Amino acid sequence: MKRPSGRAADQLRSIRITRNYTKHAEGSVLVEFGDTKVICTVSVENGVPRFLKGQGQGWLTAEYGMLPRATGERNQREASRGKQGGRTLEIQRLIGRSLRAALDMSKLGDLTLYVDCDVIQADGGTRTASITGAMVALVDALKVIKKRGGLKGGDPLKQMIGAVSVGMYQGEPVLDLDYLEDSAAETDLNVVMTSTGGFIEVQGTAEGAPFQPEELNAMLELAKKGMNEIFELQKAALAD
């Protein structure tokens, strides 16, 4: 088996995490997984949704979108269509669920964190790149809140979160699929993990033949290897 990119089966794409990418948001990152590029921002606002009022905890929610020409052909803006598509809703809910797992909301205070992930160039793995980059932006946003005198109840950050794709390509498990591989893969799996080794979400679909339990286990082991590298990259980015 030879991957189109020439990478080894267990090799990530080149990953770059650039912090403080925009000047207004409390946390902002440009994350690059190969040719996939996503701007992730975290904005802080006072108050919480109505369903949380009086409960003594904060909230985090996420939105996701793609520039019209993030892909090979221009896509119409969802705003001009008047509604978000099902894929967009699914991905932004995944991002929100994943990042909420990083926080103890009771220590956040009466604040809402808005995570915005905007894909400026797509070459596979946009949701996993979004989660990985937004996590770093979230850490920076928490630092800003603390500087402003917030987080009196302590640090709400419980653990780091990251995500990566794995799949069965030409009968072999491969890590971090780009678009060419993703479109031809027999199985595509998106894995969200914590820095302590737990799983937040595993989304898997067989496109060709059903995948077997041993193939699933092999893909999960590959995902864990990739996530260990991604957590080190997040750590290095935050150390700058």
From Swiss-Prot:
GO terms for molecular function: 3'-5'-RNA exonuclease activity; tRNA binding; tRNA nucleotidyltransferase activity. Disulfide bonds: none annotated. It catalyses: tRNA(n+1) + phosphate = tRNA(n) + a ribonucleoside 5'-diphosphate. One of its GO terms (biological process) is tRNA processing. Its EC number is 2.7.7.56. The keyword RNA-binding applies. InterPro entries: ExoRNase_PH_dom1, ExoRNase_PH_dom2, ExoRNase_PH_dom2_sf, PNPase/RNase_PH_dom_sf, Ribosomal_Su5_D2-typ_SF, RNase_PH, RNase_PH_bac-type, RNase_PH_CS. Gene3D superfamilies: GHMP Kinase, N-terminal domain (3.30.230.70). It is an enzyme of class 2 (transferase). Keywords: Nucleotidyltransferase, RNA-binding, rRNA processing, Transferase, tRNA processing, tRNA-binding. Phosphate binds at residues 87, 125-127. Belongs to the RNase PH family. Phosphorolytic 3'-5' exoribonuclease that plays an important role in tRNA 3'-end maturation. Removes nucleotide residues following the 3'-CCA terminus of tRNAs; can also add nucleotides to the ends of RNA molecules by using nucleoside diphosphates as substrates, but this may not be physiologically important. Probably plays a role in initiation of 16S rRNA degradation (leading to ribosome degradation) during starvation. Homohexameric ring arranged as a trimer of dimers. NCBIfam families: RNasePH. PANTHER family: EXOSOME COMPLEX COMPONENT, EXOSOME COMPLEX COMPONENT RRP41. This is Ribonuclease PH. It comes from Pseudomonas fluorescens (strain Pf0-1).
